[in-house]
Structure formats: C-alpha cells, structure tokens
Amino acid sequence: MASLRKTHPLLKIANHALVDLPAPLNISAWWNFGSLLGLCLASQIVTGLFLAMHYTSDISTAFSSVTHICRDVNYGWMIRNMHANGASFFFICIYLHIGRGLYYGSYLYKETWNIGVILFLLTMMTAFVGYVLPWGQMSFWGATVITNLLSAVPYAGEALVQWIWGGFSVDNATLTRFFAFHFLLPFVVLAATLLHLLFLHETGSNNPAGLNSDADKVPFHPYFSYKDLLGFAILLLALTSFALFAPNLLGDPDNFIPANPLVTPPHIKPEWYFLFAYAILRSIPNKLGGVLALLFSILVLMLVPLLHTSKMRGSTYRPLTQLLFWALVADVLILTWIGGMPVEAPYIVIGQLASLIYFSIFLAFLPLAGLLENQALK
C-alpha cells in the first residue's frame, strides 16, 4: 500500500515539493537562499502579526504605540527588533538569491525568473509602506518624497499623488491605508511565492555546472532538507544576534523623532536596501527621467533572459562574464554608498558614472561578452 503522503490530495503536493522532489546532486550553498527567503517571509508574517495586535494606525498614536510595544508588551522589544532587522535579512537573502540566479544562468527559466522579479517588486512595496508605520521623521519624509515621485507621471501625476495620499499631504488617511497595504501585501507575496515554486518545479533546479542533471538527482529529503536546516540555524543565529546586540545599527536615528511636517531632516534617505535604486534615481537631473531609471533599475532584470547570447548557461566556465558579474556587484555596492551620501561635489558624478555602468553591464557588456566567448569556443 502506498504511503499516505503519496496518496492524500494535500500531502501529495507537499510531498512533491519537499520530500520526493528530485534535486541536482551538485547544488551548492548558493541554492539555500530560496528556502531562507521562505523562512524570512514566515518570520516576518509571524512577528508582524504580533506587532499588529498592539499597533495603532493613527498619526496621533502610531509613534507612541510603537514605544508602548517596546516598553510594556511582553518581549515586545524583541518582536519589534526581529521584525525590523528581519526586513534587512530578507533583502540580504534576496540580493544573494538574485546574484546566484545571474551568475549561474538560472534566469533562463523565464517564468520562474519573471515571477521572481515581480516578487522582488512586491517585497520592495511591502518594505516601503512598512517603513512609514512607526511615524518617525524618516517615515514621514520618506513617504512624502517617494509618493511625490508619481507626480512625474504626465497629465495624471498630481491627481495620482493626491489619490494615494487621500488628501493634499501625507496625513492620517495615508498612514491608515499604508497599514492596510502592509498587512495585505505579505500574503500576496506568499501567493506569488507558491507560483514561483510551481514554475520552478516544472523544470527542476539549475546547478553550478549549468548542465542537464536529469541523470544525477537525489531526493530533496533528507539530503537538502537537512542542508536547508543548517542554513536556517545560521540565519536565525545571525538575526537574533542582530536583534539583541545591534538592533538599531541598520536603522536611521531620525526615526526616533516623531514625524513633524514642519521640520525637514537634513538628509532624506531610504533604508540601506533601497539605496542603490535611490542613487540611480538621484543621478538623473530630470524628474520623470529619474523615476523611469528607478523603475528600470529593477525591471532591467526581466531583460536578462532575452539578452543571453552565450552557448553556455552559467558563468562557471566564462571568465569574461565572471569579470563583468563581479564588476556589477562592486557597482551596486558603490551605488549603495552613494545613495546614502548628500547630493554634492564628488558624489554626484560618481553616482552618475555608477548608474551608467550599471545599465551598460546589463544591456551591452554582458551580451557582448557572451558573443565574444562563443567566438573563443570555435
């Protein structure tokens, strides 16, 4: 008689995804980040749910309700620190996951890749509306600056901004709806994650060699389930250490000041994980141009599968592409640094150069390197 996990309508799905899934034998630790992102999402939903039980989405009480959570709620400080730093770890895992996909050519699974990019955009939206909720100075001014970007939309811009604000400025209506969105979006992310997995399991995982691995697969459990558990332990250790020892290291000190529409902070900047895109936005002097560059800095990922010219899949045996990949990594780090700097003398031109290099690598250098390497193979 067949096991229940193979016959039960629900357990059968879980079995095919987590137990009997054929996985390539040679996938490295770079393939751990998908499951780590699942762990981050679960952790964020659980901690977020407990925070939502005590948070009030009203401008007169939002800031003090967060203070109340940290002071008066049992382990409230811990839940809040886990949630705030959990977002940072979420994005660290996302960037490593995307980097792995770019390096090893996983983007050639087009449906999986494109849903991944949509997931990335959804996660960015979720993090943005979440950052507004504590109603500190940076929350308020960040919301004002970023929502204002929509005014660059021709003809409908002004109406669009006021529609999102629910008035003529960022006010109570804005905070209330942002809380509603922040509660809803993680579940949309969860649904999109299931689609991401569904499409991945249609093809199976890629591997470091970039070759077909049908002849050499092992069951996901116990091999990769235990490998993932090790990753879970490392991530949770790092996250709890951060939440306990350096909870405010990645935050902005300005957010400890309650929101004041009459006082603008000296440097308005988003959380560290958005700085690279913020730098690209600022490097273009035209408002609409900047907004388009900001959008395209993420959407350019959708073009990567279309611009793949090489006969080989991954970068494992392609030295030129490897060089460009690491140049891209360095470039994103430079953009992240520039995004946190004031708009003045050396930083402006560095940001513009780094933005130009960012798009050039994606749109020109990588496809050209692929063609060159094809020639070298002949």
From Swiss-Prot:
GO terms for molecular function: metal ion binding; ubiquinol-cytochrome-c reductase activity. Its main location: mitochondrion. Binds 2 heme b groups non-covalently. The keyword Transport applies. Heme b b566 binds at H97, H196. It holds the Pfam family Cytochrome_B. Its cofactor is heme b. The keyword Transport applies. Coiled coil: none annotated. A ubiquinone binds at H201. It is found in: Mitochondrion inner membrane. Heme 1 (or BL or b562) is low-potential and absorbs at about 562 nm, and heme 2 (or BH or b566) is high-potential and absorbs at about 566 nm. The cytochrome bc1 complex contains 3 respiratory subunits (MT-CYB, CYC1 and UQCRFS1), 2 core proteins (UQCRC1 and UQCRC2) and probably 6 low-molecular weight proteins. Component of the ubiquinol-cytochrome c reductase complex (complex III or cytochrome b-c1 complex) that is part of the mitochondrial respiratory chain. The b-c1 complex mediates electron transfer from ubiquinol to cytochrome c. Contributes to the generation of a proton gradient across the mitochondrial membrane that is then used for ATP synthesis. This is Cytochrome b. The gene is mt-cyb.
